[in-house]
């Protein structure tokens, strides 16, 4: 996997409160830029492995694209991993929540590409990295504001 972007943010919140927000991908657009819509497409609970969503996201020079997201891993109050079917990037989002003390957490957010294609890695991913890091930086500020309000 190729790292596209990452952030680490200290937030005045409990791990449980943060997890409840983060695991509900229908709320992803509240804090992550350029998410137009995101909706559940199966009856599994948020955070359950196999839970699936359909996300509409804005992509520069392309417009809006629909991406199918699936919860690949989840550990209650600690970690959420989703994988998307956006070809050729094949994104994987990994969110880790660490309790620093009773009232403060550290949220580590990372986005990876699962693409094995060397041309994609060489030609496309450098620009995707810049875009995703910009979005991630905005998202970390928004997430902090949302959880601390």
PLM-predicted stretches and their roles:
Residues 8-12, 39, 56, 70, ...:
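Generic structural detector for well-ordered beta-strands
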Residues 83-134:
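Beta-strand/loop substructures that line and gate deep hydrophobic ligand-binding cavities in soluble
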Residues 40-89, 138-149:
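Glycine-rich portal/gate segments that line the openings of hydrophobic small-molecule binding cavities
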Residues 2-8, 52, 66, 79, ...:
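Intrinsic-disorder/low-complexity, polar/charged segments enriched in Ser/Thr/Lys/Arg/Asp/Glu/Gln
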Residues 1-44, 48:
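Hydrophobic ligand-binding cavity/cleft-lining segments
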Residues 17-22, 28, 53, 71, ...:
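Hydrophobic pocket/interface hotspot
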Residues 31, 74-75, 100:
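A short, compositionally biased micro-patch
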């Amino acid at each position: 996997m190729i790292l596209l972007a990452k952030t680490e943010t200290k937030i005045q919140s409990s791990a449980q409160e943060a997890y409840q927000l983060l695991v509900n991908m229908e709320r992803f657009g509240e804090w992550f830029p350029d998410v137009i819509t995101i909706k559940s497409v199966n009856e599994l609970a948020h955070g359950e492995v196999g839970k699936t969503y359909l996300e509409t996201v804005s992509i520069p020079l392309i417009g809006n694209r629909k991406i199918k997201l699936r919860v690949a891993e989840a550990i209650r109050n600690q970690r959420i991993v989703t994988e998307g079917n956006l070809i050729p990037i094949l994104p994987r989002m990994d969110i880790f929540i660490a309790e620093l003390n009773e009232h403060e957490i550290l949220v580590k957010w990372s986005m990876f590409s699962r693409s094995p294609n060397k041309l994609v890695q060489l030609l496309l991913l450098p620009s995707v990295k810049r875009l995703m890091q910009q979005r991630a930086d905005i998202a970390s500020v928004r997430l902090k504001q949302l959880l601390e309000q």
